[in-house]
Amino acid sequence: MYSPPKVELTHKAFLMTQKWSNINLPGALHYVTGTVRYRIRVFQQDRCCAAFLEVLSVLLEDWPCKLIVFVIMPDHFHLIVNPRDGNIQGFTGALKSLTAKKIVEITGDKRFRLKEPDRDGSTYQVWQDSFKSMPLWSGWMIWQKINYVHANPVRAGLVRSAKDYQWTSFRAFYSRSDEPLPVDQDWWWPDDLEKMSKAMKELGWNSAGQLCKK
Protein backbone atom coordinates (compact mmCIF):
# COMPACT_ATOMS: atom_id res chain seq x y z
CA MET A 1 0.00 0.00 0.00
CA TYR A 2 1.04 3.59 -0.53
CA SER A 3 0.39 6.30 2.04
CA PRO A 4 0.06 9.84 0.68
CA PRO A 5 2.42 12.62 1.74
CA LYS A 6 1.02 15.30 4.01
CA VAL A 7 0.77 18.22 1.62
CA GLU A 8 -1.05 21.48 2.26
CA LEU A 9 -1.65 23.66 -0.79
CA THR A 10 -2.87 27.17 -1.31
CA HIS A 11 -6.15 27.34 -3.23
CA LYS A 12 -4.33 28.54 -6.35
CA ALA A 13 -1.79 25.71 -6.13
CA PHE A 14 -4.54 23.14 -5.59
CA LEU A 15 -6.32 24.28 -8.74
CA MET A 16 -3.07 23.93 -10.69
CA THR A 17 -2.81 20.29 -9.67
CA GLN A 18 -6.29 19.58 -11.01
CA LYS A 19 -5.45 20.52 -14.58
CA TRP A 20 -2.63 20.30 -17.09
CA SER A 21 0.06 22.65 -15.80
CA ASN A 22 3.22 21.46 -17.64
CA ILE A 23 5.32 22.76 -14.75
CA ASN A 24 8.67 21.29 -13.78
CA LEU A 25 8.20 20.06 -10.20
CA PRO A 26 11.30 18.19 -8.94
CA GLY A 27 10.47 15.37 -6.56
CA ALA A 28 7.01 14.65 -8.00
CA LEU A 29 5.85 12.02 -10.44
CA HIS A 30 4.57 13.46 -13.70
CA TYR A 31 1.62 12.24 -15.75
CA VAL A 32 2.33 13.03 -19.41
CA THR A 33 0.27 12.83 -22.59
CA GLY A 34 1.53 13.33 -26.14
CA THR A 35 -0.72 13.31 -29.21
CA VAL A 36 0.14 12.68 -32.86
CA ARG A 37 -0.48 15.58 -35.25
CA TYR A 38 -3.87 15.41 -36.96
CA ARG A 39 -4.57 12.37 -34.76
CA ILE A 40 -2.91 10.16 -37.38
CA ARG A 41 -3.06 6.59 -36.05
CA VAL A 42 0.59 5.72 -36.60
CA PHE A 43 0.68 3.42 -33.59
CA GLN A 44 -1.65 0.98 -35.27
CA GLN A 45 1.64 -0.21 -36.76
CA ASP A 46 3.52 -2.43 -34.34
CA ARG A 47 6.81 -1.20 -35.80
CA CYS A 48 6.05 2.33 -34.64
CA CYS A 49 5.12 1.14 -31.15
CA ALA A 50 8.30 -0.90 -30.89
CA ALA A 51 10.36 2.05 -32.14
CA PHE A 52 8.75 4.37 -29.57
CA LEU A 53 9.66 2.03 -26.71
CA GLU A 54 13.16 1.51 -28.10
CA VAL A 55 13.74 5.27 -28.08
CA LEU A 56 12.23 5.57 -24.59
CA SER A 57 14.49 2.81 -23.29
CA VAL A 58 17.62 4.50 -24.66
CA LEU A 59 16.52 7.89 -23.35
CA LEU A 60 16.04 6.45 -19.86
CA GLU A 61 19.67 5.30 -19.93
CA ASP A 62 20.93 8.79 -20.78
CA TRP A 63 18.44 10.82 -18.75
CA PRO A 64 18.04 9.59 -15.14
CA CYS A 65 14.31 9.04 -14.87
CA LYS A 66 11.96 6.56 -13.21
CA LEU A 67 9.42 4.97 -15.54
CA ILE A 68 6.30 4.06 -13.58
CA VAL A 69 3.68 3.16 -16.22
CA PHE A 70 2.98 3.74 -19.90
CA VAL A 71 0.53 2.99 -22.69
CA ILE A 72 0.79 3.60 -26.42
CA MET A 73 -2.58 4.18 -28.04
CA PRO A 74 -3.19 4.42 -31.82
CA ASP A 75 -2.71 8.20 -31.91
CA HIS A 76 -1.27 9.19 -28.51
CA PHE A 77 0.67 7.99 -25.49
CA HIS A 78 0.48 8.31 -21.72
CA LEU A 79 3.40 8.03 -19.30
CA ILE A 80 3.96 8.45 -15.60
CA VAL A 81 7.62 9.25 -14.98
CA ASN A 82 9.88 10.81 -12.36
CA PRO A 83 12.86 12.63 -13.94
CA ARG A 84 15.55 13.04 -11.30
CA ASP A 85 16.10 16.68 -12.25
CA GLY A 86 12.36 17.36 -12.39
CA ASN A 87 12.68 18.69 -15.93
CA ILE A 88 9.58 17.11 -17.42
CA GLN A 89 9.53 19.65 -20.24
CA GLY A 90 13.04 18.73 -21.35
CA PHE A 91 12.47 14.99 -20.98
CA THR A 92 9.23 15.01 -22.95
CA GLY A 93 10.71 17.29 -25.60
CA ALA A 94 13.61 14.90 -26.12
CA LEU A 95 11.27 11.90 -26.29
CA LYS A 96 9.03 13.54 -28.88
CA SER A 97 11.95 14.71 -31.01
CA LEU A 98 13.69 11.32 -31.09
CA THR A 99 10.52 9.31 -31.66
CA ALA A 100 9.42 11.67 -34.45
CA LYS A 101 12.54 10.83 -36.44
CA LYS A 102 11.88 7.11 -36.08
CA ILE A 103 8.22 7.41 -37.03
CA VAL A 104 9.04 9.39 -40.16
CA GLU A 105 11.66 6.80 -41.15
CA ILE A 106 9.19 3.96 -40.70
CA THR A 107 6.04 5.44 -42.19
CA GLY A 108 7.23 8.00 -44.73
CA ASP A 109 3.82 9.60 -44.20
CA LYS A 110 3.61 12.79 -46.27
CA ARG A 111 1.04 14.27 -43.90
CA PHE A 112 3.86 14.99 -41.47
CA ARG A 113 5.72 17.20 -43.95
CA LEU A 114 5.85 20.93 -43.30
CA LYS A 115 5.33 23.46 -46.07
CA GLU A 116 8.45 25.24 -44.85
CA PRO A 117 11.21 24.11 -42.46
CA ASP A 118 10.61 25.18 -38.87
CA ARG A 119 13.04 27.31 -36.87
CA ASP A 120 15.11 24.22 -36.03
CA GLY A 121 15.35 23.28 -39.70
CA SER A 122 13.03 20.28 -39.43
CA THR A 123 10.93 19.50 -42.50
CA TYR A 124 8.35 17.39 -40.68
CA GLN A 125 6.17 17.47 -37.57
CA VAL A 126 4.87 14.24 -36.05
CA TRP A 127 3.55 15.47 -32.70
CA GLN A 128 1.18 18.26 -31.80
CA ASP A 129 3.07 21.40 -30.78
CA SER A 130 2.59 21.09 -27.06
CA PHE A 131 2.34 18.24 -24.62
CA LYS A 132 0.29 17.89 -21.46
CA SER A 133 1.70 17.06 -18.04
CA MET A 134 0.43 17.08 -14.47
CA PRO A 135 2.51 16.68 -11.29
CA LEU A 136 1.47 13.85 -8.97
CA TRP A 137 2.59 13.15 -5.42
CA SER A 138 -0.31 11.94 -3.27
CA GLY A 139 -1.33 8.30 -3.22
CA TRP A 140 -4.82 9.04 -4.52
CA MET A 141 -3.57 11.14 -7.43
CA ILE A 142 -0.93 8.59 -8.42
CA TRP A 143 -3.17 5.52 -8.31
CA GLN A 144 -6.00 7.29 -10.11
CA LYS A 145 -3.68 8.02 -13.05
CA ILE A 146 -2.06 4.56 -12.99
CA ASN A 147 -5.48 2.95 -13.29
CA TYR A 148 -6.50 5.43 -15.98
CA VAL A 149 -3.40 4.68 -18.07
CA HIS A 150 -3.84 0.91 -17.89
CA ALA A 151 -7.58 1.06 -18.58
CA ASN A 152 -7.16 3.21 -21.71
CA PRO A 153 -7.14 0.32 -24.24
CA VAL A 154 -10.24 -1.20 -22.61
CA ARG A 155 -12.15 2.08 -22.70
CA ALA A 156 -11.19 2.48 -26.37
CA GLY A 157 -12.56 -0.99 -27.16
CA LEU A 158 -9.19 -2.33 -28.31
CA VAL A 159 -9.20 -5.23 -25.82
CA ARG A 160 -11.51 -6.67 -23.18
CA SER A 161 -8.85 -6.84 -20.48
CA ALA A 162 -5.94 -4.47 -19.83
CA LYS A 163 -3.53 -7.41 -19.56
CA ASP A 164 -4.26 -8.38 -23.16
CA TYR A 165 -3.06 -5.12 -24.71
CA GLN A 166 0.47 -5.43 -26.05
CA TRP A 167 1.75 -1.85 -25.80
CA THR A 168 1.23 -1.16 -22.12
CA SER A 169 3.10 -1.52 -18.84
CA PHE A 170 0.25 -3.48 -17.23
CA ARG A 171 2.12 -6.81 -17.15
CA ALA A 172 5.44 -5.21 -16.25
CA PHE A 173 3.80 -3.24 -13.45
CA TYR A 174 1.80 -6.05 -11.84
CA SER A 175 3.81 -9.14 -12.81
CA ARG A 176 7.28 -7.56 -13.03
CA SER A 177 7.61 -8.70 -16.63
CA ASP A 178 10.27 -7.20 -18.89
CA GLU A 179 7.87 -7.10 -21.83
CA PRO A 180 7.37 -4.89 -23.66
CA LEU A 181 9.54 -2.68 -21.41
CA PRO A 182 10.38 -3.02 -17.71
CA VAL A 183 9.21 -0.34 -15.29
CA ASP A 184 10.64 0.88 -12.00
CA GLN A 185 9.27 -0.68 -8.83
CA ASP A 186 10.87 2.04 -6.72
CA TRP A 187 9.20 5.26 -7.81
CA TRP A 188 11.24 7.80 -5.85
CA TRP A 189 14.77 9.22 -5.78
CA PRO A 190 16.40 9.50 -2.31
CA ASP A 191 16.24 13.30 -2.33
CA ASP A 192 12.74 13.70 -3.76
CA LEU A 193 11.10 14.99 -0.58
CA GLU A 194 13.77 17.64 -0.17
CA LYS A 195 13.52 18.67 -3.83
CA MET A 196 9.73 18.83 -3.74
CA SER A 197 9.64 20.89 -0.55
CA LYS A 198 12.10 23.38 -2.04
CA ALA A 199 10.21 23.58 -5.34
CA MET A 200 6.86 24.07 -3.61
CA LYS A 201 8.24 26.94 -1.53
CA GLU A 202 9.55 28.58 -4.69
CA LEU A 203 6.07 28.22 -6.21
CA GLY A 204 4.42 29.65 -3.11
CA TRP A 205 2.97 26.31 -2.03
CA ASN A 206 3.09 24.85 1.46
CA SER A 207 4.27 21.26 1.94
CA ALA A 208 5.09 18.89 4.77
CA GLY A 209 5.27 15.19 5.44
CA GLN A 210 6.55 12.18 3.54
CA LEU A 211 6.28 10.87 0.03
CA CYS A 212 4.24 7.81 -0.82
CA LYS A 213 6.08 4.67 0.26
CA LYS A 214 5.64 1.19 -1.16
Name each model-derived stretch.
Residues M1-K214:
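Short catalytic/metal-binding and nucleic-acid-binding patches
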